[in-house]
Amino acid sequence: LALTCGLIGLPLVGKTTLFNLLTCAGAETSNFAGRTKTNVHTAGIPDARLDFLAGLYHPRKYTPAALEVIDVPGLSRGSGAAFLAAVREVDALIHVVRAFRSDTVLHVEENLNPARDLENVDAELILADLQVVETRLERITAGKKIKGETLVEQAALQRCQATLEAGQPLREADLAGEEWQAVRSLGFLTVKPALVVVNIDEDQLHQSSYPFEAELQQYASARNIPVLTICAQVETEIASLEADERSSFLEAMEIAEPGINRVAQAMYSRLGLISFLTAGEDEVRAWTIRAGTPARTAAGKVHSDIERGFIRAEVVNYDDLARLGDLGKVKEKGLARLEGKEYIVQDGDIINFRFNV
């Protein structure tokens, strides 16, 4: 699945720092607005289950699930067209907003208000979608006769128009299945799954609060957008440490896990993706599929021959393996099971496909 997440927001909010944390790409950051270059790189999705399997099998190769991440240049005056064009190319949106204070990194709006900044970026996306809706409605009404599929599309567009004019993204629009199909090709921006990441400073991290938090949470909640906080400055320090030092640092800071892990996992989830796992001495690997994928289709992710010659999927629940610590013990207790081609693969299933070609 070649799916992409776009980091969007105003300039100087920490998008490129977050991009580097997700991808280890080492893209250049700066203390001034005006970047026009789009950064693109792959981000591995942290998965403790895969780490456990690696400890069990000591494989020659370790392959986590991955997503492509695009660092879109910040939305600034005069950059609207380029910004919107870049947003059209991604499958999901991560709105990065700034709550951190800094004397060296100026805010483009001169004062901090992450709720306002989020709303302003959203407004650009809503306005762009509204223009698409209005243009298409004008073309439909200019036609001689409106019937059949066009009638369905017109009704869908009118619902979309009402949603957008109310300041809501189209992912919240109340459209029937056939109505979504009728407008799918229009490439709406506010249909894309979204996530908000608030970049806070170290003091705010310790205080567990930031300015305008209630307003931002209220705005996001009304639009069913999850909100995560991350202190990119601290996360950069964490990323620079060796594994043993990292554990001590996290414990001293009273952080359960690096915030960047939560962001990566949330990106994956917002795209409706899950992972099934394969494990052995050669490789432990997380395979990316959409939630609801049947076993035979999942087998095709590993190899087309396995899908073609699919017989059964030998499935082990990760929690059972983690609890018992040994695949042999899982089988002894009758907890390994054989599933057919229609079995819906669950997140974290450890699968060995039986096939014949």
For the regions a protein language model found, what residue spans apply to each?
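Conserved G1/Walker A P-loop phosphate-binding module
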Residues: 1-106, 122, 133-135
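C-terminal-of-GTPase-core extension/linker across diverse P-loop GTPases
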Residues: 2-8, 12-13, 19, 139-346, ...
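Short, glycine/charged-enriched secondary-structure capping and boundary segments
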Residues: 22, 82-84, 108-111, 210-212, ...
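Conserved nucleotide-binding/hydrolysis micro-motifs of P-loop NTPases
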Residues: 25, 48-50, 73-76, 98-104, ...
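Generic, low-specificity signal for short hydrophobic/alpha-helical stretches with a mild N-terminal bias
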Residues: 35, 51-54, 103, 115, ...
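Amphipathic alpha-helical transducer elements in NTP-driven molecular machines
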Residues: 43-50, 63-66, 80, 84-91, ...
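Short intrinsically disordered coil segments
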Residues: 56-60, 111, 330
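Long, charged N-terminal accessory/stalk domains
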Residues: 68, 80-185, 196, 228
